[in-house]
Amino acid sequence: NSKLWNKRKDKYGERLYFSKKLIENTKYLFDDNFILGYRMGGNEPELENGIENAKILESYGLDILHVSSGVPNPEYKRQVKINNFPKDFPLDWIIYMGVEIKKHVKIPVIGVSKIKKESQASWLVENNLLDFVAVGKAMISQDKWMENAKKDFSLRKK
């Protein structure tokens, strides 16, 4: 789907054509109870393009979007790979892309990247910045991560 990498000249070179066909055929195979999600690069190559792609993907009938980073152009050497990343945003630029994309779609959005503490994940969900947060390395490296995540937060059952 990336304009940086997909150089095909046929219909599969069109932005999101392959994704559209994949979504259509998957929806054909399963009933309406099947939740269909899609992991997307939020920077294709910039956040504005990711927002545009998210809206198109939503129109194809997806149930949930999982926003990560796109595969960068090897010539793209910046550490933060989007323009206009606010300096006061307390978390990673990849999480920020998910937060921004959520503002433009109606389906749930999952964010990911460098969530080290359960309080970070809770802050994102409790402030309606994201619907879900994917956590990987922190759960492996911190044996008490899940236990700490069970602490009382405003959205959790008491």
Q: Language-model features: where?
A:
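Flavin-dependent oxidoreductase catalytic cores
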Residues: 1-158
